[in-house]
Structures are given as C-alpha cells and as structure tokens.
C-alpha cells in the first residue's frame, strides 16, 4: 500500500485494517471497507454493509469505484465459527475463492491481494489458482497467529494483466472444486447436505437457507 492508492478492505469489522490503510494511503488515497457487520464510522473510510459473495454488494462496490483503479485488496474474511474445524475450514476456502473471483477482474494490473485463510483441504488449489494470476504468491503467518496452526495469510503480489493457463478458463472456485474432486476429497455430484465437513462450496448457503 502506498500514498494515493485505492484499497478495498473485505471483512473490515471492527476496522483495524481500514484505519491502517487510511494512514498509509493518505489524503489522496481511497479506502472502501465491506462487512456483514456494521462498523463504527472511520475517518476516511467508505463503509459498506453487505455480503461480499452476493452480486448486489459487488455491484455496489463497482458502482462506488466509478472506474477508479484498485491497487490493493485485503481480506480478513472468516466464517461464523461452529467449532467443527473441518466445516469451518471448508467454508473459509469457499469464502476466499469467492473474494478472489470478485477481486481479480477489478484489481489493477500490478496490484496486490492479501487474504486470511484456514489451513487444510483445498488450500493448495487456492495457492495454485493464485499463482496463475499473480507473479509472486507466498504464505505468511504473523507472530500473533503462529501459536495456532489453523490460520495463515496468502500474500499475492503483482497481478498479471491476464491469467495464465487454466486461469483463463476456470474461476478460482471452479478450479479448487475440480482439484478436490480429482483428489477424492469430494465426489462429483455429491449431495450438498453431505458436503459439510468436506468442502465449503455451497454449504454455507445451503445451511443459511435451512435456518
């Protein structure tokens, strides 16, 4: 992040990353924060209350940008934890895929994408999908997170003008789901209700519909 940059902070509640982004980007920068939970007002931050995985929220953000280039997208998005790690981790992968698929088309070439992600099944597919979209991809665990092996950050630097290889034909979500089918983590055509604890794709939506 640099002075004058435009930043999107996904999963911004309670606002810590957004505050840092405002300080770094300065008066010439722009920071948009989005979260399901309302945040207290933050000077210099445009706040959106909504689900980043839903088209109406995505469309609102694109409308707010009005063509402004986006230099960095940071995501601290996390599922509502159930205490069942396999399910929580699967939904985390699902959410990260959704945010990446929204971010890549609107992120400026040369831009950066940073996201929190839970370790486990599907993470290697996410890393591979990132590598065909960015020139440098690394995992990073801050000191505060190193006592827990479950959480890490994926740091993607220098977005390519165009995705390479399979990235031209498949979304991140499609690729990750395909790799998990091919590796036997999930079975193609498996009922959604049976996917809980195996993969987050569609599970959090199905669970929400049942509530």
What is each residue range found by the language model?
Residues 85, 89-91, 95-140:
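Conserved Class I SAM-dependent methyltransferase catalytic core
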Residues 14-27:
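Conserved SAM-binding loop of SAM-dependent methyltransferases across substrates and taxa
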Residues 5, 29, 111:
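Glycine-centered, small-residue-biased loops immediately flanking beta-strands
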Residues 1, 25, 65, 106-107:
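A generic alpha-to-beta junction signature in SAM-dependent methyltransferases
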Residues 34-82:
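S-adenosyl-L-methionine
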Residues 147-211:
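SAM/dcSAM-binding transferase cores
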Residues 28, 36, 62-63, 166-170:
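Class I S-adenosyl-L-methionine-dependent methyltransferase catalytic core
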Residues 2-13:
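Conserved class I S-adenosyl-L-methionine
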């Amino acid at each position: 992040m640099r002075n004058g940059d435009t930043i999107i902070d996904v999963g911004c509640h309670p606002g810590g990353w957004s505050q840092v982004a405002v300080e770094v980007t300065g008066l010439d920068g722009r920071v948009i924060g989005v979260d399901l939970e309302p945040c207290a007002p933050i000077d210099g931050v445009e706040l959106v209350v909504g689900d980043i995985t839903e088209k109406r929220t995505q469309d609102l953000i694109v409308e707010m940008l009005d063509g402004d280039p986006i230099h960095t997208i940071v995501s601290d998005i996390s599922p509502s934890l159930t205490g069942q790690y396999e399910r929580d981790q699967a939904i985390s992968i699902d959410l990260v895929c959704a945010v990446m698929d929204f971010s890549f088309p609107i992120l400026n070439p040369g831009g950066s994408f940073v996201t929190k992600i839970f370790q486990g099944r599907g993470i290697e597919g996410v890393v591979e999908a990132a590598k065909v979209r960015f020139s440098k991809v690394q995992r990073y665990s801050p000191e505060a997170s190193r006592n827990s092996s479950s959480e890490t950050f994926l740091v993607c630097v220098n977005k390519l003008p165009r995705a390479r290889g399979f990235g031209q034909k498949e979304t991140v979500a499609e690729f990750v789901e395909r790799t998990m089918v091919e590796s036997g983590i999930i079975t193609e055509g498996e009922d959604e209700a049976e996917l809980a604890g195996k993969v987050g794709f569609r599970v959090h939506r199905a669970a929400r519909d049942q509530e």
